[in-house]
Structures are given as C-alpha cells and as structure tokens.
Amino acid sequence: MYKGSHTKMINQRKQLKTIIFLSSLTGLILVALIVFFGFSYILATATLVPAIVSCTFLITTSKKQNGGFLYNTNILTGPIILLGLLVTPIISTIIISTIFSFAIYSIVVSFLMPMTFVSIFFYLPLSIYEKYFKKNTTIPLIIPTLTVIVPAYNEENNLGKTLRSIIEADYPNKQIIVVDDGSTDKTYAIASKYKIKSSSKNRYCIIRKRNGGKASAINLGLRFAIGEIVIIIDADSIIERSALKEMVKFFQYSDVVAVAGRVKVLNRSNILSNCTALEVIMGANLLRSPFSLFGVVMMVPGAMGGFRKKSILQRGLYDKSTLTEDFDITMKLLKNGGRILGMSSISFTEVPLTLRDFYKQRIRWYRGNFQTLLKHKDITRTNRKYGMLHKFGYPITLFTFIIPPFLDMAIIGFAVIAILGGTGMSLVVPFVLFMFLQLLLSSIAIMMEGKEDWKLMFYSPLGILGYKQIINFIIIKSIFDVLLRKSFRVTMR
C-alpha cells in the first residue's frame, strides 16, 4: 500500500516537472523567435537569462501534494525569486547596453522587455497546469454548516438579485445573514421581503445597525454566524448555483483557512467596462493561479470569499485601519499560517461605467492595497515564520504593484524624447512586440476562461496603450497619497 502510493507520488512529481519544463521551454522559444525576427535579437540575451533562471527555479523546487504545492525551504528563498525577476534583467540590460552603446531610451526599452517576458515564464506554466492538469477537488462526505453574510449599504437596486441567487444556490441547511449598515434607501425593506422564504434549509436573519462601514457590518454578522464556514458576498454580486458547494469542497483540507471566489463583469456595455472585464479575466487565469498553487492567494475578494470562522476569530476579525479590509484580513490569515486557495466558480458583479466612478473605485482600492502592504511590511523581516508568504506571496505582490507603473511612465517619457529627437522609428519594433505579446496573453486568458466572448480581444491593445496608463496613473497617485498621508477626502476631490 505504502509502496504503491509512494510510486504514484513520484510519477506525479515527474509529470508535473515535465509539464512545467515543456510549457516554459515552449514560451522561451516563442519569445526568442519574436525578438529575433523583430530585429532586436541582441535583447534575446537579456530575455533568456532571467527566463532560464525562473524556469530552473520552478523545475527544481516543485512538489505536488494534496492538490497544492509544497517547497523545499532550503532551496526556495526570496533572493532566488528576486534574482530571476529583477536583478538578472537589470544586470543583463546594463551589460548589453554598455557593449552595444545603446541610447538611454533603448536601455529602458531593453530592460522593460525582459521584465515583461519574465512574468510570462514565471506565471504561465503554473497557470496552464492549474487549469488543465490539476485534479479537481472531490466533494467531502461531511457537509459542514455554512453561513452566508451579506453586508449592505444603500443597495436597493441590487440586493434582491443577490439574495435570490444565494437562496437558490445548491447547498443544504445554509444560514443567510443580511447586515443593513445604516442604509438610507429601501435596502432594509427589500431584505425583509425575503424573510418569508426562510425555511429549515434557508435560515434567514436580518440585522440593522448604524452606519459604520463594511468591516463593522461583517464583524457584527460573524457574531450571529452559526456556520463552521462563513462565505461573505457583496450585496451587488450574483453567484452561480453551484458556487457555495464548490467553495466548501476546498475546506476539507484542514490547513485551508480561506478560499477566494472568481469574479466576472456583469454589465459590459462600453469600452471601459469591457477593458475591465478583460483585465479581470487575465488576472484570474494568468496571475492568480500560481498564488493558489502556492497556497498564498493574496486577496480574497469581497464579491465572494469563504473563510473558516475560527480562523477569522483567532486573528481579531476585520479591521478598519485600511481602505481594503478584504486584503487586510487575507494578509492576517496568511500570517497566522494555513493556505488560501482560489476556486473556479463565479460571482457576477457590476463595474463602473464612467471614468469618474472608475477613478473613485480604483483610488480607494489602490490606496488600501498600499496601506495594507505597508501595514504588513514586517513579513519581509521574518525568515521562516511566514513561509511562502515571506518567500513568494508578499515580495511578488509588492514588486508587481509598485515597479510596473513607474516603468511604464518612464518608457513613455523616453519614447516622447525619442520622437522629439527624430529617432522615434527605433521604438516601432518594441511597440509591435508588446502589442503582439498583449494579444497573445489575452487570447490565452480568454481561451482558459472557456465560455467567454472573443470580442474582448478587440480591447486588448488598450492594455498596452490607454487603459493601462489610466490604471498606472491612479496607482502612482495612490502611492504618493499614502506616503504624504493625504486624507481620503482630499484624494477624492
């Protein structure tokens, strides 16, 4: 019995390494060909070196166990990750640019290209494995008690649809708690209509309180929660019928403390909302999967997230010290140990349709994200206590949040200088490569999504020029607002 299980584990490990190696090698060859035929073959060296480092890192450290990844902590260290993602591209770029006497804007371009390509090698193989090769988690024999908490403030237009989707969700004996956070519209009246549908299978509870914010509403709901597992759903989200049962499956593993749901855009009606939809799809399929396999999904979204109730209680509930309480509670749970995974079931939510509303939403998100990263900066000073959070989750999240926006603004500045100096044609090939890369990534993400509208591909170029710059501007502003300690009201003006 033991010998057979051991042999099976070895075979699974070999299969995993082979998949990662072949996926990485395919991407490596593809990018090398793109760079070569783009008449920028010299940059291939700067691209290949960090890519090889990343591939080697993945191959030599991966072990598959219990549907997730565990790593040899003697091999896997933060410096190795930073070497592959940051240090090696910088060194490669400096050496190559010095040898071939590149102009300053060419140096920036040659640095930015490897940085972009490395992210593909680091994320894409794991994303492909998680999507197509990872075995599905089986439904546990014992169905745990479940509580769904819906914090609501002035949600008269959305709450009814949300509650209907929860009540109709396929899960036995669930408790539904609606917390009206001092709404001034008909939110409470709408919530009360669904109380008559309360039954032995759907125990329904409405709590009314003075306005205190989402964190206080959730904390109050937790006081009345009877479920071993608590799922928190925003009042403007609509969940799939199988979402609750799919989410609970992951909690059969005792070390899983939370599960992040998938979000899809419901109101795709203009350019902005379609760009947001594509951004969400790419983030879910290409970026989140590696974090899930490592057990360190860094954000359990408010649209739909599941938690082991005792884990939240142990970490002191939700905190109002940042603007993104969802990110903060996720970090607190990760610091306390255990895994946080991502799931494939979906909740649908509406996104802003105007630039003004989009700015208001994102400035709050990004300010809150940076506040949370600073609040938990002690993770970087601890070598062993926080495990994969210290070695992978936090440094990668911090790096990808801060560095890309400034790099993007820098490349735009140098491009303007090049155009004004009459050498703008030298930027044509890098721009074409970036555009092709964006289209390639978008098509992969849409294909991995499955039932998705391929018309979103038409919005892919805006991920390079347009939508991307709007997001980067808001991120940069949010960083400086936090560092300068500007109040949120000042930011919102």
Q: Residues of each region from the PLM?
A:
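Short, acidic, metal-binding catalytic loop of nucleotide-sugar glycosyltransferases
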Residues: 164-173
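Acidic helix N-cap motif at the loop->helix transition within catalytic regions
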Residues: 160-161, 185-194, 218, 242
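Cell-envelope/extracellular polymer assembly enzymes that use nucleotide-activated donors
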Residues: 144-147, 175, 313, 328
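N-terminal membrane-anchoring/stem segments of glycan-assembly enzymes
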Residues: 1-142, 448-449, 471, 481
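A conserved acidic beta->alpha catalytic loop
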Residues: 172, 180-189, 211
